[in-house]
From Swiss-Prot:
Organism: Mus musculus
Family: Belongs to the shisa family.
Protein name, entry field: Protein shisa-like-2B
Cellular compartments per GO CC: membrane
Primary localization: membrane
Positions of transmembrane segments: 65-85
Gene for this chain: Shisal2b
Topology relative to the membrane: Single-pass membrane protein
Subcellular location per the Swiss-Prot or TrEMBL entry: Membrane
Keywords: Membrane, Transmembrane, Transmembrane helix
């Protein structure tokens, strides 16, 4: 065992007072406390080299239980937030009214002169279709009337 591990160098404590260097074990300490341990502002003799805390480890359990409770609450809040976002997204996406297809196609807007020309052409086309339909209808009516007249004449002759 080296002398350097048994010698604690001098240091300034938290209240800014200088603590003289000392040898481990100190008077009044057990024979097992052979090593110099601690921080730059608190040094003491301990039984294991590299030990940094002069306290028993039981106080750590109370700290870790508090930390676990805090982390658990934070996790629940985060989970509630994520679930809320998912529900709102679902409602936003799937509860919209369904769009009905009305059969109309989207058309690009044209200048007014081009639009008027198209309207005039369409009106002329509709009139031509209307006239040909009417003529066909009248032609059919004439044929029906001729047949009716022939049948009437035959009945009269008999």
């Amino acid at each position: 065992m080296s002398q350097s591990s048994r010698l604690c160098s001098g240091y300034y404590s938290l209240n800014r007072s200088f603590v003289e260097p000392f040898q481990c074990p100190q008077r009044g300490d057990g024979a097992a406390l052979l090593y110099c341990c601690g921080f730059a502002d608190l040094k003491y003799c301990c039984s294991e080299p590299g030990s940094y805390f002069p306290y028993k480890h039981s106080y750590m359990w109370s700290l870790s239980i508090g930390a676990l409770v805090g982390l658990g609450i934070a996790a629940l809040v985060l989970l509630a937030f994520v679930i809320s976002v998912c529900v709102l997204c679902y409602l936003f996406l799937y509860t919209k009214p369904q769009r009905l297809d009305n059969g109309l196609k989207l058309q690009h807007l044209e200048t007014s002169s081009t639009l008027e020309g198209n309207i005039n052409r369409k009106a002329k086309g509709l009139n031509a279709v209307s006239n040909s339909t009417n003529e066909t209808f009248y032609e059919a009516d004439d044929g029906t009337q001729e047949k009716t007249m022939d049948i009437t004449q035959i009945n009269i002759a008999c």
